[in-house]
Amino acid sequence: MKKILYAAAMTALMASPALAENIGVSMAKFDDNFLTVLRNGMQDYAKEKDGVNLQVEDAQNDVSKQLSQIQNFIAQGVDAIIVNPVDTDATPAMTKLAVAAGIPLVYVNRMPSDNPLPAKVSFVGSNEVDSGTLEMQEVCKIMGGKGNILVLMGELSNQAARQRTQDIHDVIAKPECAGIKIVEEQTGNWDRTQGTDLMTNWISSGVQFDAVVSNNDEMAIGAIQALKAAGVDLNKVIVAGVDATQDALAAMKAGELDVTVFQNAAAQGSGAVDTALKLAKGESVESMVWVPFELVTPANMEQYLSKN
C-alpha cells in the first residue's frame, strides 16, 4: 500500500508545473521613455516563460530607495535580482548585499562600477564606447570636420553619460574632426525639459553653434523644441541624440533630428531576464552580455520605427 501511495505521489509531483522563478527588479525610475521600453521588454519576455514572476519596483531616481528595494528582495528570498542602477557608483554596495545573500544579480543598461564583477553577477547592456562614438563620427561627417558644437550631458553620476561625453571628446581629437570645437557642455540629466531650458539659455546668451550633440534623445528633443520656439532654422543646425526612441524617430521623420543611435531597450530587457534565469539555475553566463548599438540616420530610419 505504501509503495502505491509513494508511486502516486511521485506521479503527481512529476505532473505538476515546475517551481516558479521569482525575480525582483529595481528600475532607476518608471518616468522615462527609454526605461519604459526596457521594463516592457523584461515583462513581455517573462510572460513567455512558464512560472516566471517579476516583481518590478520604481526607485524614483533615489539611491537609498533602490538599496532598500534590494534588501527587501533579499528578505523575500527571490531567486534572482535585476537592477537598473540609479547611480552606477553605488553598485558595489548592491553587489555586496546580493553576494552575501547568495542571490544572483544582473545589472541592466547602466554598467556597474564594480570591476571585475564577482561570480553570479552579470551586466546586460550596450557598450557605451560605441554609442557616443557612432553619434559623433556621423556629426563630424555631416559638419565636414569643422564648426562649433554644444554638448548636452546626462546625469553625471551615470557611467553612460560620462562615457558618451568622453566618446565625443575622443572623436573630435582625431585629425579628421580636429576643426570641431565644443563651445558649451552642460548636464541636462537625461531630461527633455532640462534640455529645453539649457538650449533656451544658450540661444539667449548668443552662443554661436552649428550642432547640438546630446547624450540621449530626450534632451535632444528638448533642444529641438527650444530651437523651434526661438525661430531657428533647423535646416542650418545639426541635432544628434542616442536611443532611437519613438519620439526621436518621429522628430527625424519630420526633418528635425539628424542623428541618433539605436539602443535596443527591449533586447536588453529580455536579455536581463534570460541571464537572471540562467544564473538562478546555476548555469554559466558571461559577466558582460553585450547588445550592439546601431547608427540611425534619415537614410535607414524606416527599419527602426517599430523597434523601440
Question: What are the functions of these language-model segments?
Answer:
Residues 3-5, 13, 19-308:
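A residue-level marker of the well-folded mature domains of exported/periplasmic proteins
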